[in-house]
Amino acid sequence: MSIRIIPQDELGSSEKRTADMIPPLLFPRLKNVYNRRAERLRELAENNPLGDYLRFAALIAHAQEVVLYDHPLRMDLTARIKDANDQGKPPLDIHVLPRDKHWHTLLHSMIAELKPEMSGPALAVIENLEKASEQELEQMASALFASDFASVSSDKAPFIWAALSLYWAQMASLIPGKARAEYGEARQYCPVCGSMPVSSMVQIGTTQGLRYLHCNLCETEWHVVRVKCSNCEQSRDLHYWSLENEQAAVKAESCGDCGTYLKILYQEKDPKVEAVADDLASLVLDARMEQEGFARSSINPFLFPGEGE
């Protein structure tokens, strides 16, 4: 199954009535995304061997929150949604969508917000980014979107991605239309932008018990049934791993068919779990999965592979 976004005026009456029964997509609601993430990162930093880095990530998330309100985005995406639907492509496809300089503004505003909080190597990194030309910034963005991580140092990547992510999330939150699930491929990628997930979450509330993958770029969530590999869609050789017990709120779902794994978070076990923060705070589980011979099928926006990884 794949997911397509249909312009509102092209939905049939039956689709309009049933669109909310099992929502294929949950577009980002940006009001509390970054503050909640920052708070969760700070909470998880306590008694965590990665505490310093989690607090560093919290500073970036807080800067995203501030810049979000300082630099709102106004854009009419109606035509783009229609064109993407006609072509069967994600409307905000990272591989073809022209990037507006708005994301440069977001990056420089984030740097200004972060500079008083940074010191040492981290301060040197953002000062270097502050001096980068528009062409250099675009080259780094293109490399990250092409998964050419060797071309962007792992200390610069989180800042570049944070600005791009905020830009894409602003656009995604403005999409006019509904989503429809249909037969197709590439369910492992975000239907809105084509990026990959950071983790998946079994939710509570109106989507109780449903699993949604969370995009590591535009913050959209899309539905994928449980007990099915989110990478290759096989279900015959799935296993679930945790560092605690069967009631753990964070597990890794591994697939013997494709040899990959993805974190799965359970809100019913801990309502405070957050897709990015809890994934980053459980890197010990990632190390265990690598020892077992599985490759990660996702990327955390605060932790990019370095050269040779």
UniProtKB/Swiss-Prot annotation:
Taxonomic source organism: Salmonella enteritidis PT4 (strain P125109)
Principal localisation: cytoplasm
Gene Ontology CC, one term: cytosol
One term of GO molecular function: ferric iron binding
One Pfam family matching this protein: FdhE_N
Keyword field: Cytoplasm
InterPro entries xrefs: FdhE-like_sf, FdhE_C, FdhE_central, FdhE_N, Formate_DH_accessory
GO biological process entries: protein maturation
Homology family: Belongs to the FdhE family.
This protein's name: Protein FdhE
Name of encoding gene: fdhE
Known role: Necessary for formate dehydrogenase activity.
Domain of life: Bacteria
Intracellular or extracellular location(s): Cytoplasm
